[in-house]
Amino acid sequence: MQREKDSLIVVSGGMDSVTLMYEKRASIALALSFDYGSKHNARELSFARLHAERLGVEHLIIPLDFIGQYFQSDLLLSGGDIPEGRYDEENMKSTVVPFRNGIMLAVAAGLAESRGLRRIYIANHFGDHAIYPDCRASFIRPMTEAVRCGTTNGVLIEAPYTDITKTDIARIGASLGIDYAETWSCYKGGVFHCGVCGTCVERREALHDAGIPDATEYEG
């Protein structure tokens, strides 16, 4: 018996959300992406669209122009240069987009209820905890309860990667046959991955530690 497609997924086009989309594809009716004015939005969104089409999942891109216009973050086109280094270094905090996941989950909740969907998937993971407060379990738990209480049909948020690492996610993706060269991570949003910003460093380490050949094209 085929499982009911009763879920939507917030998908950026990066390793984590693409992996989750493949893992939960049997239940996903809608893939939801956001154009919020980040330096790497265009690069990410092309891969989100690619994988949604490949899986036969409807894909929506919702503009959140106000974030790029009014919020402060070096991740945004309106911000400064992307710092280089690991996620846990102090300078990477400048890439935080305030309450980004909260805003996206709120929009996703309204859309899920409008579509009669019961579940939202989001692919935050343990490696995000160091600098992104809206990726931590301490945020996801109360946000889940708020969405459940604030929707008529009790929409649920499921964040199954919250307590696992990007290396763990890479292993899941490898078991699903995902080609990670068809995902985007780099915050700089250039032609190639820079290889030295926090998300590039994490990507390289995750693939290496998972024993997966890294076919990503890096600058230099």
From Swiss-Prot:
Binds 1 zinc ion per subunit. Pathway: Purine metabolism; 7-cyano-7-deazaguanine biosynthesis. GO terms for biological process: queuosine biosynthetic process. ATP binds at V11, S12, G13, G14, M15, D16, S17, V18, T19, L20, M21. Its EC number is 6.3.4.20. Its cofactor is Zn(2+). GO terms for molecular function: ATP binding; ligase activity, forming carbon-nitrogen bonds; zinc ion binding. InterPro entries: QueC, Rossmann-like_a/b/a_fold. Keywords: ATP-binding, Ligase, Metal-binding, Nucleotide-binding, Queuosine biosynthesis, Zinc. Zn(2+) binds at C186, C194, C197, C200. It catalyses: 7-carboxy-7-deazaguanine + NH4(+) + ATP = 7-cyano-7-deazaguanine + ADP + phosphate + H2O + H(+). Belongs to the QueC family. Catalyzes the ATP-dependent conversion of 7-carboxy-7-deazaguanine (CDG) to 7-cyano-7-deazaguanine (preQ(0)). NCBIfam families: 7-cyano-7-deazaguanine synthase QueC. This is 7-cyano-7-deazaguanine synthase. The gene is queC.
